[in-house]
Amino acid sequence: MEVIEKLETIRETLNDTKDKKDFQKIHDELVQYLDGVDSLTIDDDKWNEILKLFKTIIIKLKSSTIKTTPLENELLQHEKKRTVKEVEKVEEDIKTDVTNDTSKPTLMDKVLQVSNQPNNPYSADVLQIRTILSKTLFVDTDSEAYSLYVPESQKLDVSPITIELTTIEKYQPKVNILKQAVIVPSQNPLLADTYGAPEILFSTDFFDDITSNSSEGLQLYFFDKAYKLKKELPNLPFLSSLDKDVNPLNPLNSVCKSFGQEKYYDMVMDRTDRGLDARRAAMQFDNVIVDAQNRTVQFNVRMHPFDLQLLRISQQFAEPMQDLAPVVREYMMLGADGYVLTQKIRLDRDQQLIANRRSVVFDRMCELSGPLYRSRIIHSMRMMSKLWRTNVFRTSLEDEITKIYAAAEVSMISIDATTSALSTINIASAEQTLNALLNMSFFRCELDLIGSQSSFGAAMSAMIALMILPTDQENMDDEVFDVLCNLVYNELIAWAADRPVFVRRAGATNAFRQFVNAGLNRDITNYMRFVLLRRPWLPLYNSRDVRRNAHVLVPNVDLANINDQVYVAINSFLNGIIEASRRNPNPNKTISANSFRKLMKNMRDICVNRLMPVIRLIRYNVERIGMILHMLPYSADIFDINRNLRDERLRIKIPMSGFLSLVMGITKAPDAFDWSQILNFADDVRKMDYAEAISIEDSASVAIMRNDANRATSKKEIFISEVRPPTPTVASIQKIPSATLTAIFSDRQLINLIRDTHSFRVIREIAVALQAAFDNSPTSQHGVGKGAVLHPVPQNFGRSSQFVRRDNILLQRPAGIQQFTIEDLKQGRYFQGLMAQIRARQPIIVNGPIPLRISDAAEIEQVTLAFLTMNSPYDAYIDPRDLKQQKLLTDREVDLFIDQSPARPNDEFDNVMARTSVFIIDAPRAIVPINPQRLNFPYHDIMVTDSVTKFIEFTVALTPDLQLFNGLLVFEQ
């Protein structure tokens, strides 16, 4: 291709070139050539080849000290064009697909539909300004890169949080059934054995994985299997449907085909099998009874006790619910502020809502880990940022500042330091400060002052900040308080009153404390004394749980009374500055005397008159969001929980000039609160809390249980491997350093909270049911026995059940034989007693889960090996290395031999496997009962929801002027 050939030629020319002028000439020619090339028509493969050549050329030019910025910019432009072209192509393909489906409106139809409406969503966000994570907190607005600040407007989705609700009829039985014939052994050696009447048995397939997964211990296997079973269990305690059919033996009755009962009925209805007559007789009385009045259903099932136990666990430990009707009424009362809320439909008496499931385990983990706490607080702030109504600013303050300069008779022709007095005042600072103040009402934070601290505007802003901010020691650090006081003193008081500038030193860090009794103007002294009171904010709403949400605080400033202490203090302070500057020929280091006095008078009017709208705006937002305080995301103050952890608080950056910018910037009333959005937000938080609680508590419960069973296992590693993060906050747990996470999971209070969770109780109950199922089910065919009896001399084979010819299984432990447990022998306990029994050639019983070596009766090699090991049990079970260590080093396998096929006359294996000295202890096979178990469950539709707002209809009823509850306008011009 022409472009590739051209670039290869240039690369070869560069290798031969040595003069810098020639390099520059080649660079300029290449830029000019690239400008005329249409890169959109180039294939992807060739474009990649071109990029490689360009990189080689650019590296060569840079090594020759040639500035390659124009060439790189040109190449970047071509890449952007190609990207845009690809996006357009994809969108065009999507449009083509949509157009093919005529039933769906196209994107153009939607655009045309809303084009005439005043609020067009397709043109509202035309201006897209680059946003960064949590810029409300951390953007330095004094830097040029972010001089224009636009808050995030996109909705924070709490998807993909989906709550799956399953009713009891979705339960799949874990124990299958099978039909097996009885073996009738022949008493005559010349006659073969025969099959007798069949019987229906419970299988033990659910223990198929016990050999492969129980290598670390049977208890760990139970916990892992219980954790998997918990995820499969239904989480609603009722039935919504039932698979029924006519009883074939009694047309007046019905039978239940759910819960695996259809397979049983198919087996029983084999009328050629006369051995099942008793079961068919009992089946006539099976029936399903539905009580529509009480909404219950009764039906008959024949299930394994393990399945019945799991059903009881799923019903007893179903997900906690709450009645929907009271919550709907609460939502309707909340939304009565400017809205009329009505129910869309009449609610059923069984209509339920997922209960607020707030994880105390997660709260405790946040208390133990500072990074996790801050991550969760930032996530909550970002979620709440879209609720504030802060659209109250003009586009720019330049005109306002120009008017102030003109009124102060500051000449704009001679640019000097005077014009920089208010240079840091801008809308970006106002936005950031307002968001910080609103966040400080709900979250306790530490302040981090940024920006210039040596200008007139910053000093005026600090003077207002000392009135608005909470200056008590619990909410404001002494360092921040000293910085604000010193700035006000040095930039406003010291020059105006002709006093020496304050310099910090040991023992004297605060200018106000140093000079409050130094004979200053009375008005100035009153302000300083008022500031030194260090007044806190007022509590507006008290939290129900300080470990979940902090109290809601608001500035301690009156909304209506202009004679409130704060307004009077600011007014008298500025009057005192003006009065002091009258006697001083040089009242400011950078502003002339006349200009300074006029500037101060303008500032007095602005600060005193426009501070009240700021307070009203803050109260307007906080009052409404504070109403749903108990529905808000996590906002606890770690200082309330542990006084030693104040340093773990989040640090909010506030521009030093932000308060004056805020006072000057508010020009209009805020938008009305959208209660539909706020209540939808409450629903989203409920779902998020539920998903976080399930994720954290499930994985933490498994970690604690596995550690209880085996102290060598790491709780931290199990937790990280099992957790499935639904939110970024839970995902941040995986970023905690390893040693820190280990220390967190060593906290006794956290472990006790985990043991008290719903997840822990469910998993423990399932594990107990699994243990009982193991103890009472035959598991020898799956490779694990309950124990073994070792005889010194071979004994005759037995017959443990009527379904086998012979086997070496015992269903009961023989009496009068010394017993040992595997765990004791592994620890070295009673090992000498075991050796004494062997030396005395006495039989022994080894209790505990024992791995088995299963021999197939049809293979001569396996039978021969089994004959050798089963007739020398001591040599096979005790290893010489065990004698040296005086303990059992590993679990030893013992032989299991089952012959369950009818034998021909004169079977050759009878002579080989005639006797054995090894017997396996196991449970008997479970027969499906003839008479059924009768179950009774609630029976109604799935009336459980995770959203309240979808049952509510919103009607706007706004007054002409936006008002507070006490009837005061937010802003009066």
Curated annotation (Swiss-Prot):
It is found in: Virion. InterPro entries: Rotavirus_VP2. Keywords: Capsid protein, Inner capsid protein, RNA-binding, T=2 icosahedral capsid protein, Virion. GO terms for cellular component: T=2 icosahedral viral capsid; viral inner capsid; viral nucleocapsid. Its main location: virion. Inner capsid protein that self-assembles to form an icosahedral capsid with a T=2 symmetry, which consists of 120 copies of VP2, with channels at each of its five-fold vertices. This capsid constitutes the innermost concentric layer of the viral mature particle. It encapsidates the polymerase VP1, the capping enzyme VP3 and the genomic dsRNA, thereby defining the core. This is Inner capsid protein VP2. It comes from Rotavirus X (isolate RVX/Human/Bangladesh/NADRV-B219/2002/GXP[X]) (RV ADRV-N).
